[in-house]
């Protein structure tokens, strides 16, 4: 199975997001991208939507429930939210939804900043491997991979997807 081209998914995602927000009466949501791929996808969506609002960024490294097992990522970046969270409608963007743990960590961090009116979840890919009850409101494509396979977004320009096969320890 070949991987989709993100540039082909983004226009439909923008259209689906526009419809989703209109259905809920949300006119000026604030966008938040999760480092690093979620930021790239959020930037591309903002361009597709013609939205000039500032983009918030989250690095959820300290909020992950597995960092004591895996250690911190060597490039922890500060989160930057150039707007108030309280009462805002947020669009949270990630590149690949797998277990749901990154999204859980992002929600925990967002709520440390304030109480949003709503959070709409947008993911480029959904790998159908969730361990938590988290589901995207807008998704580019759903894929099923083998247990030893992963997908990574590379970018920022052009955006592309790479498949990785995990090596098994003997």
From Swiss-Prot:
InterPro entries: PRibTrfase_dom, PRTase-like, PyrR, PyrR_bifunctional. It is an enzyme of class 2 (transferase). The keyword Glycosyltransferase applies. Its EC number is 2.4.2.9. Signal peptide: none annotated. It catalyses: UMP + diphosphate = 5-phospho-alpha-D-ribose 1-diphosphate + uracil. GO terms for biological process: regulation of DNA-templated transcription. SUPFAM superfamilies: PRTase-like (SSF53271). One of its GO terms (molecular function) is uracil phosphoribosyltransferase activity. Belongs to the purine/pyrimidine phosphoribosyltransferase family. PyrR subfamily. This is Bifunctional protein PyrR.
């Amino acid at each position: 199975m070949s991987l989709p081209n993100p540039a082909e998914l983004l226009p439909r995602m923008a259209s689906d997001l526009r419809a989703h927000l209109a259905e809920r009466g949300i006119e000026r949501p604030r966008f938040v991208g999760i480092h690093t791929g979620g930021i790239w996808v959020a930037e591309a969506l903002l361009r597709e939507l013609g939205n000039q609002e500032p983009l918030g960024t989250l690095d959820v490294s300290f909020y992950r429930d597995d960092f004591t097992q895996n250690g911190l990522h060597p490039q922890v970046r500060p989160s930057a939210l150039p707007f108030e969270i309280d009462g805002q409608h947020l669009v949270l963007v990630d590149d690949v939804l797998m277990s749901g743990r990154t999204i859980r960590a992002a929600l925990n961090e967002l709520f440390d900043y304030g109480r949003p009116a709503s959070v709409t979840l947008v993911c480029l890919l959904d790998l159908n491997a969730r361990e938590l009850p988290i589901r995207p409101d807008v998704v580019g494509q759903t894929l099923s991979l083998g247990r030893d396979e992963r997908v990574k977004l590379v970018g920022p320009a052009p955006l592309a997807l790479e498949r990785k096969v995990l090596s098994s320890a003997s």
